[in-house]
C-alpha cells in the first residue's frame, strides 16, 4: 500500500533543488502530518518533522487558531486542493519551491566593537532559512486572511503559489526575503 499525504498526494517523487535545504526538508511519506510533539525539545529534531506539519504548526500562530491543529490541518488540505486545481501540479512540490524562494540567504547581525555597534552581513544557516520561510508564509497568510472575504485556505494557497513563482509584488515571504537581503547587502 502506498502512503500519501492526506491520502491524496505522493511525496516520494519530489526533489529539493537547493542542496543546502535538502537535509532539512523532510518529505517522508505520512498519512496525516501530526507527530504529537515527538520531535520537540531536542536540538535539530525539527529537521525530522514532515515539512507540511511544520507549516501547520506555524499557522497555529494567531490567537483564534492556537492549539486547533485539526482546524489548521483542514485549512492546509483545502489550500493544497486549491493549488492542485489551479496549477495541475503536486501541491507539496509547489510548497517546496515556495520555501526555496522564500528563505533569505544572508542577514545582518549586530556587532559591538569598542563601544560602537554596527551591523555586519552574515550567511544564514539552512535551518534558519527554512524556519524564516515557513514563518513568513504563515504570517503572510494570516495577515491577508484577516478581515477579508477570502478564506484562510485561499490566502494560504495564494501565498504558496506566489512564493513558488518568486513574485515579489504579491508574496509576503518573498518581499521579506528581499528586504533582509537588501539590508544585508548594504551592511557589507
Curated annotation (Swiss-Prot):
Q: Which InterPro entries match?
A: Ribosomal_uS7, Ribosomal_uS7_arc, Ribosomal_uS7_dom, Ribosomal_uS7_dom_sf, Ribosomal_uS7_euk/arc
List cellular component terms (GO).
small ribosomal subunit
The cross-references to SUPFAM superfamilies, in alphabetical order and at most eight, read:
Ribosomal protein S7
Which keywords accompany this UniProt record?
Ribonucleoprotein, Ribosomal protein, RNA-binding, rRNA-binding
Q: Which Pfam families match?
A: Ribosomal_S7
Any one biological process term the GO annotation gives: translation
Q: What GO molecular function terms would the record report?
A: rRNA binding; structural constituent of ribosome
Q: Which PANTHER family match?
A: RIBOSOMAL PROTEIN S7
Fill in the subunit field for this protein.
Answer: Part of the 30S ribosomal subunit.
Q: What does this protein do?
A: One of the primary rRNA binding proteins, it binds directly to 16S rRNA where it nucleates assembly of the head domain of the 30S subunit. Is located at the subunit interface close to the decoding center.
Similarity-based family? Belongs to the universal ribosomal protein uS7 family.
What this protein is called in its record is Small ribosomal subunit protein uS7
Organism of origin is Methanococcus aeolicus (strain ATCC BAA-1280 / DSM 17508 / OCM 812 / Nankai-3)
Biological classification of the source: Archaea, Methanobacteriati, Methanobacteriota, Methanomada group, Methanococci
Amino acid at each position: 500500500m502506498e502512503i500519501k499525504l492526506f491520502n491524496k498526494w505522493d511525496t516520494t517523487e519530489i526533489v529539493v533543488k537547493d542542496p543546502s535545504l535538502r537535509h532539512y526538508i523532510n518529505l517522508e511519506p505520512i498519512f496525516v502530518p501530526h507527530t504529537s510533539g515527538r520531535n520537540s525539545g531536542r536540538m535539530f529534531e525539527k529537521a525530522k518533522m514532515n515539512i507540511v506539519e511544520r507549516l501547520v504548526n506555524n499557522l497555529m500562530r494567531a490567537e483564534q487558531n492556537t492549539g486547533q491543529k485539526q482546524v489548521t490541518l483542514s485549512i492546509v488540505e483545502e489550500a493544497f486542493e486549491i493549488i492542485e486545481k489551479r496549477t495541475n501540479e503536486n501541491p507539496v512540490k509547489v510548497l517546496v519551491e515556495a520555501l526555496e524562494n522564500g528563505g533569505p540567504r544572508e542577514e545582518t547581525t549586530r556587532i559591538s566593537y569598542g563601544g560602537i555597534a554596527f551591523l555586519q552581513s552574515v550567511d544564514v544557516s539552512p535551518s534558519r532559512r527554512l524556519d524564516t520561510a515557513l514563518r513568513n508564509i504563515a504570517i503572510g497568510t494570516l495577515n491577508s486572511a484577516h478581515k477579508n472575504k477570502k478564506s484562510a485556505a485561499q490566502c494560504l494557497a495564494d501565498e504558496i503559489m506566489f512564493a513558488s513563482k518568486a513574485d515579489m509584488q504579491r508574496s509576503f515571504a518573498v518581499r521579506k526575503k528581499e528586504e533582509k537581503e537588501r539590508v544585508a547587502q548594504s551592511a557589507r
